[in-house]
């Protein structure tokens, strides 16, 4: 993406965050708003040099949403994404593993709530592969060229996974934002 598109995305999600924050003041029990807010925070975290704090804030908002509506599948999926992202950002293997496990649990709950969602099922599959991706994989042929090729494939797969997670988060946040901005018809 070029710089202008990045700046536009930043402005869109910052606006969504501010709208959600203002809505929260009026109605702190709106699970949909909390989910939108968390989605915006996750998107904004991509623009941060230290994204972990913003991801943690998103996890807290999603936790609030799930207290209000424990079966809210998009919040379950989004909190799974937040934990997955946090795990990949963690250099501590134990912390990363804990977050990958939480991600798997939330993705499983999302799948249970909406089993027809291909996105939720793929996210669950990805979460099961996350620990290996995080460590870069341990098994492989002994030759250097084969090892290099495997590392390259693993690295490419990581970027593919991150790309899909980011895209999926963007789509969910955009849909949530669009739904919140629909005009009310007056009849």
UniProtKB/Swiss-Prot annotation:
Tissues with expression: Expressed in roots, flowers, young cotyledons and leaves.
Primary location: mitochondrion
Topological domains, Cytoplasmic: 1-160
Keywords: Acetylation, Membrane, Mitochondrion, Mitochondrion outer membrane, Protein transport, TPR repeat, Transmembrane, Transmembrane helix, Transport
Compartments, as annotated in UniProt: Mitochondrion outer membrane
Transmembrane regions listed in the UniProt entry: 161-178
Family affiliation: Belongs to the Tom20 family.
Summary of subunit composition and partner proteins: Forms part of the preprotein translocase complex of the outer mitochondrial membrane (TOM complex) which consists of at least 6 different proteins (TOM5, TOM6, TOM7, TOM20, TOM22/TOM9 and TOM40). Interacts with a variety of mitochondrial precursor proteins. Interacts with AKR2A. Component of a mitochondrial large protein complex that contains, at least, MIC60, DGS1, TOM40, TOM20 proteins, and petC/RISP.
Protein name: Mitochondrial import receptor subunit TOM20-4
Record organism: Arabidopsis thaliana (Mouse-ear cress)
Gene: TOM20-4
